[in-house]
């Protein structure tokens, strides 16, 4: 389902809620929400998600965690994607990307993926299954899990969009 944000720079919980009514949720195990906009605003708002997974393509540079700390600090998992291109992209260092993430005091796991070459896909699927099982157990116990939302997000958002 594609959600139109109108003139907003990111999704909000109301938009996601309305879109979920278009789905038969009892038939789904996992719903992915891909937010829009830059790497600052989306991390600052609760969409009702249980986890934040941040994708970092090797074509974007290993410095992204340092440049966009709000997004990466909120991550429960960082996926390094398109890793099959590491053979031809000599200025991306996976270890440097992880080091930049750790500089943010993040303990989120880091996985390397290449959908094209099927590298790391089993590990990614296993992680998703573990998270799904953990969420099912939390739900059974009447608990939930809140995502890591940056507390200064609304202030930062207002400053970025001030006239």
Predicted regions mapped to residue ranges:
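Nucleotide-state-sensitive switch-loop elements of NTP-binding domains
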Residues: 1-50, 72
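Amphipathic alpha-helical transducer elements in NTP-driven molecular machines
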Residues: 10-13, 17, 33, 65, ...
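A short, charged, Gly/Pro-tolerant segment at domain boundaries
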Residues: 139-163
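Conserved C-terminal guanine-recognition region of P-loop GTPase G domains, centered on the G4
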Residues: 38-108
